[in-house]
Amino acid sequence: MSNKLKVTLIKSMNGRLQAHQQCVRGLGLRRIHQSCEVQDTPENRGMINKVAYLLKVEEVL
């Protein structure tokens, strides 16, 4: 299992719950189609699962 994940914001945060916006910001994303790599930890997985409908997630090999 990879220890990094590539996370891409594919939908807008406008009109979303404040907690969901904070999760996206916590993952290091600000703009649509912006990507970043995060460590594969339970904390990050929890944030990703909470806002999965806004994101595209890939394992980095």
Swiss-Prot record:
Pfam families, sorted: Ribosomal_L30 (PF00327)
Gene Ontology molecular function: structural constituent of ribosome
InterPro entries with a match to the protein in the record: Ribo_uL30_ferredoxin-like_sf, Ribosomal_uL30_bac-type, Ribosomal_uL30_ferredoxin-like
Gene Ontology CC annotations of this record: cytosolic large ribosomal subunit
An annotated GO BP: translation
Record's keyword terms, sorted: Ribonucleoprotein, Ribosomal protein
Similarity section: Belongs to the universal ribosomal protein uL30 family.
Family annotation (NCBIfam families): rpmD_bact
Subunit note: Part of the 50S ribosomal subunit.
Listed name of the protein: Large ribosomal subunit protein uL30
Gene coding for it: rpmD
